[in-house]
């Protein structure tokens, strides 16, 4: 019997601004029952910062007051005792609040953000000499921002041409970086674990085999066809995520039925890529440490044909709140 999906394992770490660190978790071995925790880690698409929500029940009042204080950071790991286990979220707590449920239960909700250094309370004031490239511009902005922004990877497919005029930048860091992305077709800006990425969605990592998706690897229910590819759910898998270049998965269509789109008059229906190969364009991890939920929802798009457009801020917020 495959034990890769048995024995839940998770760890929630919260670093408070006074230097203390709260750790709550379950290692899948001991019989001790930790506090109830629910999580919703949502990366609905490229282009933007990301919000996640964590709920903790019945913390001591001392820890509640420490975490409610400004400046807490959070890390969340989840997976299985004998299977995949890894970091799902790393970011800042931007809104904590306490609610009472019933007579004796208190729930601490932590609204968290990944990407605050790019979009929140940051600024860049610098001059770029003539002859710089767009890649050099992005790296300079990240390094010279009031709060420096770590850079993970910038696609090599950005326009290599040198700009003939010098320029002065006096703005929030995301403004000139978004302009670079708009000037490069199929390029996306996103933050992951606090690090800046610019990815070209047509790139692929030839050194990595696509992740197989079938009933033996945790597929739950029936994948749903979309305009761009398919959406599907698997048992919680920290391996699946927003990556640079985009992660590829292979759905075994010989053994998996797909719920087809319903035909609408005047609207063409897409054809599912029969190779079963898709790129991961959005991921949502969610679960309940004492409940049944322990899943990963994936948005996949075909390797050929249409690709999703960059998410605007209003559209991103709409996608994030709808899950």
Regions picked out by a protein language model, each given a short descriptive name:
Residues 1-111, 280-283:
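Assembly/oligomerization scaffold segments
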Residues 1-6, 60, 80-82, 138, ...:
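Compositionally biased, intrinsically disordered low-complexity segments enriched in polar/Pro/Gly
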Residues 20-29, 151-154, 159-160, 210, ...:
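Acidic Ser/Thr/Pro-rich low-complexity disordered segments
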Residues 37-67, 202-323:
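An acidic/polar, Gly/Ser/Thr-rich interaction patch typically located in mid-to-C-terminal regions
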Residues 80-82, 190, 212-215:
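Acidic/polar residues at beta-strand termini and the immediately following turn/coil
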Residues 89, 194, 276:
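Residues that flank catalytic or metal-binding motifs in active/ligand-binding sites
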Residues 103-211:
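Charged- and aromatic-enriched interaction segments used to assemble
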